[in-house]
Amino acid sequence: MSLSVEQEEQKYWEEVEAVKQWWKDSRWRYTKRPFTAEQIVAKRGNLKIEYPSNVQSKKLWKLVEEKFKTKTASFTYGCLDPTMVTQMVKYLDTVYVSGWQSSSTASSTDEPSPDLADYPMNTVPNKVNQLWMAQLFHDRKQREERLRNPKEKRASLANIDYLAPIIADADTGHGGLTAVMKLTKLFIERGAAGIHIEDQAPGTKKCGHMAGKVLVPISEHINRLVAIRAQADIMGTDLLAIARTDSEAATLITSTIDPRDHAFVVGSTNPNLEPLNDLMIAAERAGKNGAELQAIEDSWTAKAGLKRFEDAVIDQIKASSAANKQAAIDAFLREIKGKSNKEARAIARQILGTDIFWDWDAPRTREGYYRYQGGCQCAINRAVAFAPFADLIWMESKLPDYAQAKEFAEGVHAVWPQQKLAYNLSPSFNWKAAMPRDEQETYIRRLGELGYCWQFITLAGLHTTALISDQFAKAYAKQGMRAYGELVQEPEMENKVDVVTHQKWSGANYVDELLKMVTGGVSSTSAMGKGVTEDQFK
């Protein structure tokens, strides 16, 4: 039965007030929302739905708050499947779901791919759902077993927190802002406590450790973060939004529309060259292709004098007859901080007395992208802009470089001292070459002291599965069942890995108890009754 207009109005304003009170919670003390409670409530339906993932989001927020406060870290790795998640939660307090792993092993089309985010947008949410359902099941199974035993025996029984919060990879959002909102909705419905989204362009997205990354303007990525928060607010959840920036190694950007990006855009300083794209089009029309086109581009690039505007001005000052060149450079750098290119040009004109040639359109690629010079300071610039809209911030990096991680953390915290940071302990890094083992052992702790309160190995699930599969298959081919005993079953028993009794692990006892409950206490078809082979392991 429909509400009357008066009832509808009263319910609306009650919800608006409830949302305003919710936003006053300390959880949101650093969060900026460019929309109102009235707008959020108007986008909700009449039926209030309580999402279980909200419990997980609250749990995750409490965890990272405590870790940041104590300068420690929660650390985890990318989980492949339900078996893995049940082993991870014994020792780790969060679970990560990687887009890379999902792309290679779990696309909803079953078509493997490298990490280009070209799989259907429900791929990673589906993996989250698989792990979340497993967490819920094993939690039920464990609770039933414990409550089936008297209190005095429970201390000796497993009491694992299976419900470790899941943080998942949202790539670039798989499209425009409505796609970001739909993806966020999927993640909340499927059990994610938090998601991360990166500032790459969706059609050209690459793994964080591949070349050819194209960024979107700062404002566009902020819109994505706002879209995530708006969708979570509509659904009434505390979902954590993690902003990832790939700007440390980026070389291209889609647009120069945001002045905050201007300082890192690269232009040509050679007025005698025609624009690169015009040259390439003419060469193609002349029948050139492949290596010939590449040679033309390489030659143009070598002659173009590509550099950022501030570097071009500094070079001009150094070449000028100014009495105190360093003072002029210092004044220029001080005055252009935070300014657009138009404003920076005016400042340069005042110092040099003339305009300099610098053209950011001339080097544009055939796709229309602008050249861009990334780096740690570039990433700091973006992180500072993202901070009011993100719960954590992550800079993707090429190496496990502590000095760089420190530079980034200090740069962000100089503006936003309470900003929580995340760090990818990537398997793309050669850890043996990067640092000695004693430093490897302390790396997570040292990063935690800098504010990196959540850290993760994206693909450890993939690599550990590949390693044991290779070791076992090789030994099995040579030794037969001896390999299974020595490499798998005996170590399982020695380490008390619960999967050694896989029927019990899978919930056979739990299901037997369900059957007994509905059949009055007796079942002649109990899975774990007389004859079950797991009696051999008692």
From Swiss-Prot:
Entries under InterPro entries matching the protein: Isocitrate_lyase (IPR006254), Isocitrate_lyase_ph_CS (IPR018523), Pyrv/PenolPyrv_kinase-like_dom (IPR015813), Pyrv_kinase-like_dom_sf (IPR040442)
The keyword Ligase is annotated on this UniProt entry: no
Active-site residues annotated for this sequence: 207
GO cellular component: glyoxysome
Residues that bind substrate: 98-100, 208-209, 244, 424-428, 458
Chain positions recorded as Mg(2+) binding sites: 169
Gene3D superfamilies the record matches: 1.10.10.850, Phosphoenolpyruvate-binding domains (3.20.20.60)
Protein name (database record): Isocitrate lyase
Lineage of producing organism: Eukaryota, Fungi, Dikarya, Ascomycota, Pezizomycotina
